[in-house]
Regions:
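Glycine-rich phosphate-binding loops of nucleotide-dependent enzymes
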Residues: 2-235
């Protein structure tokens, strides 16, 4: 049984048909990348899965159970975490308060502050600082920490590299890989192709709301012509 199975979903914004018959899978303990140019439907796919913009048709199975058109709160309690695009930490709460507030949605167990701080020692150092006092990299660490506090079995990451310096990007990528090795399933939306293919073992490339290519990350990494065709923005 797959951790996540998306079958032929169609998602609309008003009358605009954004996601068109999209299917994908994430196996237990697997990291999968969702790639594509801006505006091809990557974030809408994430929003469809987590329940913010439910698909009109199609099935989404999480741990074998139908979640298409269920409320985000229900899906979260089942064990699906989200690190949203733009990080969206609470600016007027401390690091510690941001984390403990996220833990309220945990269905079972949840991560402890000590576990979060073990992965992100910088957050321990900054635990009394407000969210708006953190650097972009620290905010991303906090956003991932918030996503982990509900003890997810699947973590959705939407553009974690956005606006981060290369050194910080390296650290974030290593942490995500550590989480995957710990057994966490990951679906990663990312514009940074190199980072995404380093983390994920498989990839899907979207174009106009549909899957244009899928396969092992190594195949895409070694195919510059395909990258130019589907991923690189023309000048």
């Amino acid at each position: 049984m797959s951790m996540l199975e998306v079958n032929d979903i169609n998602t609309y914004y008003g009358k605009s048909h954004i996601i068109q018959g999209l299917s994908l899978k994430v196996e237990e303990g697997e990291a999968v990348a969702l790639l594509g140019r801006n505006g091809v439907g990557k974030t809408t796919t994430i929003r469809s899965i987590i329940g913010f913009t439910p698909p009109k048709t199609g099935d989404i199975l999480f741990k074998g159970k139908q979640i298409a058109r269920r409320k985000p709160e229900f899906i979260s309690r089942m064990g699906m975490g989200l690190v949203p695009q733009g990080r969206r930490v609470f600016p007027n709460l401390t690091v510690k308060e941001n984390l403990t507030m996220a833990a309220r949605g945990a269905a079972k167990g949840g991560w402890s502050l000590e576990e979060i701080y073990r992965y992100f020692p910088r957050l321990k150092e900054r635990e009394k600082n407000m969210g708006n006092q953190l650097s972009g990299g620290e905010q991303m660490m906090l956003a991932i920490g918030r996503g982990l506090m509900i003890n997810p079995e699947l973590l959705l990451l939407d553009e974690p590299s956005d606006g981060l310096a290369p050194m910080v990007l390296h650290d974030i990528a290593n942490i995500v890989m550590q989480l995957q090795k710990k057994g966490l399933s990951i679906l990663l939306v990312e514009q940074n192709i190199k980072m995404a293919l380093k983390i994920a073992s498989r990839a899907y490339v979207l174009n106009k709301g549909q899957v244009a290519w899928e396969g092992p990350s190594e195949d895409l990494r070694n195919n510059e012509e395909l990258q130019q065709q589907l991923l690189v923005v023309s000048a």
